[in-house]
């Protein structure tokens, strides 16, 4: 057991999906995994392990933001030996050619979080995805004719931002979308020499105000999960 995860050794698979919402973790386990069993409910942050196409896979809720995902990613890698971590979540687009319901695969993750600045003595570390996972996820998405974009995203510490000036600036530098966790996940995966990837569904467009309905989000979410699980089969 670790501080925030109540699993015993061996209960968590080497490959894990990481939604922010613990109820999404439960949904993934019940919908996509065979023989799924709950290994964690500490603080209500549910975790499950089952099989997908014969491969053992876990899914663990992480909560929202850099501090929360950092806790779970650290403990999963340090205490349970997890090797492959795939974040599955939502994001807000900031490019004109990206529409709601599109899928974004994060090649890298810029951030305003001070976590890496403190860690690297004020230099700008560039958190980057594992190429093998990224390449496989892109192949799977394109084979299924899903609208997918690959590029840099921005991990924000602020959900309710008063001004969009920063996001407009980031858009001019080809940043695709905004979310709140990936830079921390990629940094920790680099630290532990593990493999990480973020696959995100566009739930809204920050600059145009376009949004998806709950039903639309669920449909696209299912497609994204299948991409993540099939990409995970290579590891």
UniProtKB/Swiss-Prot annotation:
Q: Might you name a Gene Ontology BP term for this protein?
A: purine nucleoside catabolic process
The residues that hold phosphate are 20, 24, 43, 87-90
* Residues the record marks as site: Important for catalytic activity: 217
The Gene Ontology terms for molecular function here are: purine-nucleoside phosphorylase activity
Stored Gene3D superfamilies: Nucleoside phosphorylase domain
Question: Which residues are catalytic?
Answer: 204
Q: Name one GO cellular component term.
A: cytosol
What's its catalytic activity?
A: a purine D-ribonucleoside + phosphate = a purine nucleobase + alpha-D-ribose 1-phosphate; a purine 2'-deoxy-D-ribonucleoside + phosphate = a purine nucleobase + 2-deoxy-alpha-D-ribose 1-phosphate
Q: Domain of life, per the record?
A: Bacteria
E.C. code: 2.4.2.1
Which SUPFAM superfamilies does the record match to this protein? Purine and uridine phosphorylases
Q: Binding of a purine D-ribonucleoside: at which residues?
A: 4, 179-181, 203-204
What transmembrane ranges does the database entry give?
none
Recorded hits in Pfam families, A to Z, give:
PNP_UDP_1
Family to which this protein belongs: Belongs to the PNP/UDP phosphorylase family.
> Assembly and partners?
Homohexamer; trimer of homodimers.
What is the name attached to this protein's record? Purine nucleoside phosphorylase DeoD-type
What taxonomic classification does the UniProt entry list for its organism?
A: Bacteria, Bacillati, Bacillota, Bacilli, Bacillales
Q: Report the gene name.
A: deoD
């Amino acid at each position: 057991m670790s501080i925030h995860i109540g699993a015993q050794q061996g209960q968590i698979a080497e490959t894990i999906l990481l939604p922010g919402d613990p109820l999404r973790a439960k949904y993934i386990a019940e919908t996509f995994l065979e023989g799924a069993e709950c290994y964690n409910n500490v603080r209500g942050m549910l975790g499950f392990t089952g099989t997908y196409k014969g491969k053992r896979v876990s899914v663990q809720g992480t909560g929202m933001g850099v501090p929360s995902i950092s806790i779970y990613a650290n403990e999963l890698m340090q205490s349970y030996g997890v090797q492959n971590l795939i974040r599955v979540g939502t994001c807000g687009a900031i490019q004109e050619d990206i529409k709601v319901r599109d899928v974004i695969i994060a090649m890298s993750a810029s951030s305003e979080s001070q976590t890496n600045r403190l860690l690297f003595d004020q230099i700008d570390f560039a958190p980057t995805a594992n190429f093998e996972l990224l390449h496989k996820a892109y192949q799977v998405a394109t084979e299924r004719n899903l609208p997918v974009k690959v590029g840099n995203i921005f991990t924000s510490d602020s959900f309710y931002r008063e001004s969009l000036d920063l996001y407009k600036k980031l858009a001019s530098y080809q940043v695709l979308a905004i979310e709140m966790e990936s830079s921390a996940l990629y940094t920790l995966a680099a630290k532990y020499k593990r493999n990480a990837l973020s696959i995100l569904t566009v739930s809204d467009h920050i600059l145009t105000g376009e949004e998806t309905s709950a039903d639309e989000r669920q449909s696209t979410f299912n497609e994204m999960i299948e991409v993540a699980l099939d990409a995970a089969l290579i590891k």
